Design a protein with these regions (language model features):
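Catalytic cores of Mg2+-dependent Asp-rich isoprenoid enzymes
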Residues: 1-166, 172, 176-290
């Protein structure tokens, strides 16, 4: 089977599989804040992220998942050469050149999915968690900032801060369903400090010290949100409304998770309130880039 054929069938999350990005989230709701002539490019980036993550989240055997993700990396080579073979990469062809999307960040999205597919994200060391959030969250925000016209060093630093904070927050949000599917984003250092020793990822959810293990992750997310807020004025004006809305929506989510405490891991993950998100989009649309 050729690489492009494999990439054309990346696989989706099968029945009962954990899907980490399947539902509508703040990124989707904030899309109206992206200028109309750039919105298609933003959707193409989000679609690529969804395609590769669907491979990791699917029910296929681990070697098959990793093979498909390797094929996606070859497909990025084809995209760069002007020969994309999948609907997603065809949609990325014009944005790649028009908005100078960094190929390395597209590849980082694939590498993050490979960490999921390869079983790395089960009580990973702190260094691996940091690498994962950089590849999955940082890469995504850097790509979206590029779509919005800012490929500067300042935008890159902002993207790393917001991407890490955003991804840590969504990992905490999805802690329950992920653990029941055999994943656990909490770093092993935090689990050890909290005194959690469990035979399975699902058992961690019932441990009375779960809040203590989550606290350092939440604290890091909060610190990185603060970093992103300080850096936002350095980002190009046209990019700010969308990025500010995404930042604030995920900050609100982190506060919701903190209020729910240990219950956040055993209850259905909270989704952003549609009315609140719509109001935020309208507020930022009228507020503009100020």
């Amino acid at each position: 089977m050729s690489a492009t054929t494999t990439a054309a069938r990346p696989g989706t999350a099968g029945a009962g599989a954990f899907t980490s990005i399947g539902r509508l989230d703040a990124l989707d709701w904030a899309l109206p804040l992206v200028p109309r002539d750039r919105r298609g490019a933003a959707r193409a980036v989000l679609a690529f992220r969804a395609e590769v993550q669907a491979v990791a989240d699917g029910a296929a055997p681990r070697p098959e998942k990793r093979g498909r993700l390797a094929a996606w990396r070859l497909e990025l080579d084809a995209l760069e050469a002007g020969l994309p073979a999948t609907p997603v990469t065809i949609a990325l062809q014009q944005p790649l050149h028009r908005h100078r999307l960094p190929r390395t960040e597209l590849e980082n999205l694939v590498l993050a999915a490979d960490m999921d597919a390869g079983g790395v994200m089960v009580a990973p060391p702190q260094c691996d968690l940091r690498l994962y959030t950089r590849r999955s969250g940082g890469a995504l925000i850097i790509l979206l900032a590029a779509v919005l016209g800012d490929t500067s060093h300042a935008a890159g630093c902002f993207g790393l801060a917001l991407g890490e904070a955003m991804r840590l927050t969504t990992l905490l949000r999805d802690l329950g369903p992920a653990a029941r599917a055999g994943r656990l984003c909490l770093p092993r250092e935090s689990l050890a400090e909290a005194g959690i020793v469990a035979a399975s990822t699902a058992e961690v959810l019932d441990h009375p010290a779960l809040d203590a293990a989550c606290a350092p992750v939440a604290a890091t997310a909060s610190e990185r949100f603060a970093d992103a807020r300080l850096m936002l004025p350095e980002v190009a004006l046209p990019a700010r409304p969308f990025l500010r809305a995404v930042l604030e929506a995920h900050e609100d989510l982190l506060e919701t998770l903190h209020a729910r405490g240990r219950g956040a891991a055993v209850q259905p993950p909270p989704s952003p309130g549609r009315v609140a998100l719509a109001a935020r989009v309208l507020r930022h649309r009228f507020r503009g880039a100020a």
